[in-house]
Design a protein with these regions (language model features):
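Conserved mixed alpha/beta catalytic, RNA-binding, or beta-rich assembly cores of soluble enzyme
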Residues: 1-56, 60-61, 65-71, 89-93
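Short, well-ordered secondary-structure micro-motifs
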Residues: 24, 78-79
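A generic structural motif
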Residues: 72-76
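Short secondary-structure subsegments characteristic of cysteine-rich extracellular domains
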Residues: 79-93
Length: 93
């Protein structure tokens, strides 16, 4: 996974092997704590739920607009678990 943090957004590229663009999802953080913001899949047709969930998680963790690309050979559930854990680690000091 590669993570690019900007002043107003976070880009996360979730992949195994070489970096490739995958299913692309965007999310905004919720306005209050514990509220999920708006999210949508922009491109792709594989792992729609995982890509969207990762974008929502990234937006909640970093409190910024989030764009997530997911390209993996893992199962959807396993990819969601693995990349969610990596996002949590990335935010830890």
């Amino acid at each position: 996974m590669s993570l690019l943090q900007m002043d107003n957004a976070v880009l996360a590229f979730c992949y195994d092997g070489t970096m490739k663009l995958g299913t692309l999802a965007v999310s905004t953080p919720g306005l209050t704590e514990g509220v999920v913001g708006t999210s949508s899949v922009l491109l792709g047709g594989k792992y729609l739920i995982a890509a969207r969930a990762l974008a929502e998680r990234s937006a909640a963790i970093f409190k910024k607009m989030s764009l997530v690309s997911l390209n993996t050979t893992l199962s959807e559930g396993e990819a969601l678990r693995v990349y969610s854990a990596l996002l949590d680690k990335a935010k830890s000091p």
